[in-house]
Amino acid sequence: MASKGGRDKIKLESTAGTGHFYTTTKNKRTMPEKMEIMKFDPVARKHVAYKETKIK
């Protein structure tokens, strides 16, 4: 039986101010810092930085 998850759900929110977001998971033990990644924002129609925020 698999152990209970070490992965937490996170929301990656666009820094372009469009309100667009992606959801994903990350391992808190191996990556304790906040995630920031370049992804495509379909509202702004270009690649922008997405920053990790909490899922409410």
From Swiss-Prot:
Polar residues bias locations: 15-25
Ribonucleoprotein found in the keyword field: yes
CC per GO annotation: cytosolic large ribosomal subunit
UniProt keyword terms in alphabetical order: Ribonucleoprotein, Ribosomal protein
Record field: compositional bias (Basic and acidic residues): 1-12
Stretch list, region Disordered: 1-28
UniProt-listed GO biological process terms: translation
Molecular function, one GO term: structural constituent of ribosome
Domain of life where this protein originates: Bacteria
HAMAP family linked to this entry: Ribosomal_bL33
NCBIfam families the record matches: PRK00595.1 (NF001860), rpmG_bact (TIGR01023)
Family: Belongs to the bacterial ribosomal protein bL33 family.
Protein name according to UniProt: Large ribosomal subunit protein bL33
